[in-house]
Design a protein with these regions (language model features):
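Alpha-helical transmembrane segments of multi-pass membrane transport proteins
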Residues: 1-184
């Protein structure tokens, strides 16, 4: 294989490693959780959004599921979420890594099928985001219909809006800058 496109695979893995080691993912998860505290299953929605965003930095399922399993699952169970529900949210969110560009699977498929990776990325972005949106809608409806699956956080745990806004900006800017630099 003398295709230069495959050199992107270890670079995406390295980028995911750097994002994780910098603590961007954990900050992003907790910032989104705070920002969405009024929604049913806000922590599950935050986990899904974080999975979708982190998958753009890694491009692989295993890294997303492992990291979010270590980060979000204990927090969700501690908050009183159903263990099966929390596990399903993390596993389904991790699977978004195949569809949301830049996906290593799309890169490998582009090489094998002799297609343009950029065209595959363009073709996969809408289905990936649509699937993420459908997961989020499902989780919210499921938690609304059965509140014991995902209890709302106590109101005393919610900081002032200025603190939430600052945390969201500080956690989103580095990751979005990286995504824009990579995808162009």
């Amino acid at each position: 294989m003398d295709n230069n496109v495959l050199t992107a695979v270890p670079l995406f893995l390295f980028m995911g490693y750097l994002v994780e080691r910098a603590g961007i993912v954990s900050r992003l998860f907790f910032a989104i959780r705070l920002a969405l505290h009024g929604l049913p299953a806000s922590m599950a929605v935050a986990a899904l959004v974080t999975c979708a965003l982190f998958s753009t930095a890694t491009g692989i399922i295993g890294a997303v599921v492992t990291l979010m399993g270590l980060l979000a699952w204990p927090a969700m169970v501690k908050a009183g979420y159903d263990k099966k529900f929390a596990s399903g949210v993390i596993c389904s969110g991790g699977c978004l890594g195949i569809l949301i560009p830049p996906s290593i699977m799309l890169i490998v498929y582009a090489v094998i099928a002799q297609l343009s990776p950029l065209r595959l990325f363009a073709a996969a972005i809408f289905p990936g985001l649509m699937l993420a949106g459908l997961y989020i809608i499902y989780v919210i409806i499921r938690a609304y219909l059965n509140p014991s699956l995902a209890p709302k956080p106590p109101s005393e745990e919610i900081p002032p809006r200025a603190v939430i806004l600052k945390e969201v900006l500080v956690s989103f800017v580095p990751l979005f800058s990286l995504i824009i630099l990579v995808l162009g």
